[in-house]
Amino acid sequence: IGDGCPGGENIEILWQCGKYYKAGTDEFMAKAKAEGLGGNTLKFIHYSDFIGRMDLAYAMADVVISRSGASTVSELCAAHKAAVFVPSPNVAEDHQTHNAMALVRKDAAMLVKDAEAQEKLLAAAISLVNDNERLEAMQKNIAKLALTNAAGDIAEYAYKLIEKQ
C-alpha cells in the first residue's frame, strides 16, 4: 500500500479486518494518510471490523482475498468468485491449505502462503484483477465446483437410507 499499489490505481478494496485487528488497522490507516503513503490508493480502501451482508460484498467483488475455511470456500464456489486464498497457519492439520489446494488444482483459485502474504499477496491480487482472461477462467472453474443443492442432496440421501430400513 505504501508504494501506491502499482497496477491497482483504480481498484476498490473492501476489507474486513476483524474486531481484534480494527484498532491496529485504524492506526495504520491514520498513519499512512498522515505520512502521505499510498498516493491516492488509500481513498479506495474501505474497511470494517465486520461485514454483515457478506452476500453483497461477494456480489460487488471481482476477486476475493480470504482465508480458506470450508464455509468460505463453499460460499465462494456458490458465488462464482475468483479467490486468492491465504490459508491460516494456525488451524488443525493445516486443513485450510488442503481446502485451498483443492481449488488451485482446478485453476479455480490462487494460494499465497501466510508467511509470504506481505510480500506477494497484493501483487497476486492486482495481477489477477488486471488479467480478464484468467479472471473469467477462474470464475468459470470455481462455479463448476459449487454444490448448489447440497442440503437437498443430503436430505434425499437420508430419505433413501430410511426407505432401506
Segments predicted by a language model, with ranges:
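A donor-sugar binding/catalytic signature common to diverse glycosyltransferases
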Residues: 54-96
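C-terminal alpha-helical cap of glycosyltransferases
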Residues: 148-165
